[in-house]
Amino acid sequence: TVLEMMAEFEQTQSAHDGGFWNANNFVYEEWIEENLQAEAGLNIPENWVPAIQLLSFDVAGQALGFLNLRLRLNDYLLENGGHIGYSIRPSERGKGYAKESLRQGLQVAKGKNIKRALVTCSTENPASRAVILANGGVYEDVRNGTERYWIDVD
């Protein structure tokens, strides 16, 4: 389930880029509602932008990961986060799921008229770099330890 995946991220203290929640006061139904509102740009924190929260599952229905598609960039996202943040649960990494998740996220971006998507990763994350490059990422530069890549979505 999604809750089991969230618990795995918490237990392993693994980064869950593309998935945001408050573990202390978590209520699943409220999380769903907050994500629906965020897509419409409603009740989002200051300096956040409208975003679509996506989840990935395997064929058996096991939750695999998160992908957050920001529908526009602000100054912070232009420097650090980009249009898309993603992560795969720790027990399922190294199986190609991140590559497919990003591919599908880019298709959603295309449907939202995003022509070029900025996708970033830490200079310390070669696996994410490989995922971005496999999806057509073109390196632009590094800023504060964050590699920045542009992907033509058309």
For each feature predicted by the language model, list its residue ranges.
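GNAT-family acyltransferases
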Residues: 1-83, 108, 144-154
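Conserved beta-strand-loop-alpha-helix junction that forms the acyl-donor binding cleft
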Residues: 119-129
